[in-house]
Amino acid sequence: MTKLTKFDSIDILMKTLSSYVSNDLRESLKNNKVVTLSVPGGTTPAPFFDYLCNEDLEWQRVNVLLSDERYLPEDNIRSNARLIAKHLIQKKASVARMISFYNKNLSEEEFVIKYESQMSTLLPINVSILGMGEDMHTASLFPDSDELLDALKSDNTLHVVRPKSQPEARISLSGKALASAHKTYILILGENKLNAYKKACSEKTEINAPIRVVFGSNTSVFWADKI
């Protein structure tokens, strides 16, 4: 069963998550030459990244993989890669290798075709951090995306998705790629997200609640109120 842990403050949550993730990475590095850390975009995890980049571990052996990305240049204010470079690929973690999902010379579909085999070599994910929307999406696996079923069920690592609720096309890790993680942490804040998580627990299918693709004994949910 997926475990829910509630924290008294956002800061305590972020510090604790940083400690857990760094310890998981150290354990993974004992048995692997390189490891894969999958991370989300958005503003919510920025304080966590600020703590994690100061953790002592062999960052030069860590591949930082985006869970999803808007197909935009990396200097665009809405780019997940931009946020991760600003908050995570800093200080002790500056030597980590970040893998982004953008090539100005390729369309979204061309990018996926060209880089699918390369991205698949980064699996399984050793440690994954995910967010979740109030619609129960995770990464860019949105319930209102026509590509959702294929992204959940196919063997590919990458998928182009065009959610009706979003202004840009996105590239997302597939359900199979996300579910490959040895350890997953879902980071959510506020009562609305907590209620969405509870609703996801009661749903029967991943189509209605894509976050369910990572539910299981290796997944922990960290929650704090926004107040």
Predicted regions and their residues:
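N-terminal glycine-/serine-/threonine-rich phosphate-binding loop
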Residues: 1-37
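ATP/nucleoside-binding phosphotransfer catalytic cores, i.e., glycine-rich phosphate-binding loops
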Residues: 182-227
